[in-house]
Amino acid sequence: MNGIGINKISTNPVTDKLRSGRPSVGTWLSLCSPVSAENMAGVGWDWLVVDAEHSPVGFDTMVNCFRAIQLGGAVPMARVPWNDTIWMQRTLDAGAMGLVVPMINTAQDAKKVVSNMKYATKGIRSWGSSRVAAYIDNDYRTWTEENLAIIVMIETAQAVENAEEILSVEGVVGCFIGPADLALSMEAKDIGPGTEHEAAMLEVLKVAKKVGKAAGKHCGSGEEVSMRIAQGFQFLALSSDAGLMGKAAREEFDAIDFTGGSDNSKGKAEGKIY
């Protein structure tokens, strides 16, 4: 253990699970809040992804989210805005133990992802101070060679067509399907069982299994996560901190009887304060 009582990290639990064929479930953080990150980390997720693509999160906030995630026992990850060397380098230096990289359409795109995340001679990531290095039970550079979770997003019709070549790129741990952008790319009017959209996602899963990589996607409910695990998907995101908070708030708000005529108080106010 280090000076503040956090166990040293020997491997990455996310890459360990994905490479062994097991499911790994987490959620997206889009509220740009270390407090939310800390709260979510205690739920039991394997990982939490700070969404830097579709939220206004800044680097100062991101690094504090990573700290909160780590203290809560989950693996800190991020979705970067683009396959950009500087963005990816800074996010890894800030403490991410894996990245989800959007809009990967070709094998060449995937090779660039790996290069951006690897040090020489396997990549172009520049050496600099990385705050997570203090928590690694090994040389950080050596640790990154096998343990960074390198997840590419397949979210266009072109990417589905090129999925085998993309996932065959050395260093890529798995893929994450963006169902909404995929539907837009396919001009899909319907989604769900029996649709072309569903068939495309299952084709990506089939290809991933063929080349020995993990496939994943964003899910709207725990029931869908269970269904996707049964299908063979591994890297699965359940909603987001904002989505889960909103859902819980709506459910409780809808349960309020504003007429004052309901006698539903028995047992409802009982429980522990602490």
Each predicted region: which residue ranges?
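Expand to "…catalyze enediolate/carbanion chemistry for C-C bond making/breaking, isomerization
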Residues: 1-274
